[in-house]
A protein has these predicted regions:
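Sec-dependent N-terminal signal peptides
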Residues: 12-18
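Acidic, polar-rich low-complexity tracts and alpha-helical solenoid repeat scaffolds
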Residues: 2-11, 22-201
Length: 201
């Protein structure tokens, strides 16, 4: 009984310590946001990013964009904003920011990586086979555009493999559609679908 009581007290102390640390962390982040020292904010944002605290990093990147527009830090902020969304699996928004980065900083060191990541966003949004494959087609198009732009890219092999995976998905979906008509005994539709399938493949 005494042992159980001690164990319970230790758990309560641990929970209290965790809560205090969380409150302290929130308070510190609020102070950083209110700070007028942009360099401090920038370094804090990069620290948060390194710690995989993408939400807090994004909040700081957002308030710093106007302060560093046209400066080297502005380029970094634009790129890491996209990276935050990518790592948070918000792929639609990440793709938007990668493309915007490439447009605003066409000669930046991370443009190639950004455009590859943008294509990867479409790949990661590609749905399961039974659903509409618009994102799958878009991913193929994006990877192909990337390859045309950077034929010697270090990402070229990865792009080729991902295109092959996406194309195989479309082939499988088309074949399943043909088989569905056959199983439903809609034979004319099945024949037409199979003919179209064979021509395409």
């Amino acid at each position: 009984m005494y042992f159980c009581s001690m164990l319970k007290n230790r758990y309560l102390i641990l929970i209290c310590v965790i809560c205090l640390m969380a409150f302290a962390s929130c308070g510190n982040h609020t102070q950083i946001l209110k700070s007028t020292d942009n360099e401090y904010k920038y370094n804090s944002a990069m620290h948060y990013y390194g710690q995989k605290d993408y939400n807090r990093a994004l909040q700081l990147f957002d308030v710093l964009q106007s302060a560093y527009r046209g400066k080297p830090q502005g380029e970094e902020i634009a790129y890491y904003t996209a990276e935050c969304y990518y790592n948070m699996k918000d792929y639609d928004i990440a793709s938007h920011y990668y493309k915007r980065y490439a447009v605003n900083y066409p000669f930046a060191k991370n443009v190639e990586a950004a455009l590859f990541r943008s294509a990867c966003c479409y790949y990661l949004e590609s749905p399961s086979i039974e659903l509409d494959q618009e994102d799958t087609y878009m991913a193929i198009k994006e990877f192909q555009s990337f390859k045309d732009l950077y034929p010697q890219s270090v990402y070229a092999d990865s792009a080729n493999r991902l295109i092959e995976t996406l194309e195989n998905k479309i082939v499988e979906k088309d074949f399943n559609t043909c088989m569905l008509y056959y199983k439903m005994e809609e034979f004319q539709a099945a024949i037409t679908s199979f003919e179209r399938f064979l021509k395409a493949n």
